């Protein structure tokens, strides 16, 4: 979002179709230890020669219940299982790509949602003392678009726009874990970003650019007396 010599700008991958093919489909499933499962799907579709789209989704779950060994105070080594270490995650993406006579446009929507637990520490003196039933929920959403067109041989325009919404909920409930204090925090952040870049070609060896950006970010929390930027 900022002008910098070291800035890196990544762009969404465009679908590629061979010949008259109109669909690309990729389905995958990964698995691992601790009941980990990770299915995914990518579907790319070509409506016509000018418009195409892609849908990408992924889900991941792991229980986080792995066994570990530690020595108790004045006792023998024991084996325990980590608790409250589960993670659930869902990602959804939908993008459209279009061509116009002298340019192109792109639009994308993205959603990420997750829930996870925070496992507690293993204490030698009192095994199982800290249950740590803390939980956290996250939601990240954004929609963005881009438009580029060569209006004249000497003038072109690139415009971008984006809206983003981020949400975090953290809960620590002493009714589930008496060793903790009650914490139930919500945080929300919204962002609007827009930019336009104009390119003027005066001579083949001489060109000028003019660009401008607008960005507005707001943050909110339900906590009393907490600063809201």
Residue map of PLM features:
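Residues on the lipid-exposed face of transmembrane beta-strands in outer-membrane beta-barrel proteins
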Residues: 41-45, 92-98, 143-149, 194-200
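Outer-envelope beta-barrel architecture signal
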Residues: 21-25, 37, 49-53, 90, ...
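Flexible loop and strand-edge segments within Gram-negative outer membrane beta-barrel domains
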Residues: 62-68, 79-89, 102-157, 163-189
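N-terminal periplasmic accessory domains that precede
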Residues: 1-28, 37-43
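Transmembrane beta-barrel strands of outer-membrane/channel proteins
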Residues: 27-31, 41, 55-61, 107-113, ...
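Residues that define the transmembrane beta-barrel architecture of outer-membrane proteins
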Residues: 2-4, 30, 35-39, 86-90, ...
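Gram-negative/organellar outer-membrane beta-barrel architecture
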Residues: 33-36, 50-65, 84-92
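Signature of Gram-negative outer-membrane beta-barrel scaffolds
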Residues: 206-229
């Amino acid at each position: 979002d900022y002008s910098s010599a070291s800035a890196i700008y990544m762009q969404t991958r465009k679908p590629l179709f061979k010949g008259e093919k109109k669909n690309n489909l990729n389905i995958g499933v990964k698995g691992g230890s601790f009941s980990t499962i990770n299915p995914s799907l990518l579907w790319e579709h070509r409506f016509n020669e000018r418009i195409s789209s892609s849908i990408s989704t992924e889900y991941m779950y792991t229980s986080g219940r792995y066994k570990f060994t530690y020595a108790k105070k004045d006792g023998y080594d024991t084996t325990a299982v980590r608790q409250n270490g589960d993670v659930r995650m869902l990602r959804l993406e939908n993008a459209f790509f279009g061509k116009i006579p002298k340019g192109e446009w792109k639009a994308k929507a993205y959603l990420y949602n997750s829930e996870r637990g925070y496992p507690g520490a293993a204490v030698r003196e009192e095994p199982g003392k800290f249950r740590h039933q803390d939980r956290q929920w996250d939601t990240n959403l954004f929609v963005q678009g881009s438009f580029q067109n060569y209006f004249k041989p000497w003038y072109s325009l690139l415009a971008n726009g984006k809206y983003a919404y981020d949400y975090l909920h953290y809960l620590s409930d002493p009714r589930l874990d008496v060793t903790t204090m009650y914490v139930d925090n919500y945080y929300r952040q919204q962002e609007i970003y827009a930019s336009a870049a104009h390119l003027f070609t005066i001579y083949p060896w001489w060109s000028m650019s003019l660009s401008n950006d607008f960005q507005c970010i707001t943050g909110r929390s339900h906590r009393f007396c907490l600063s809201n930027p």
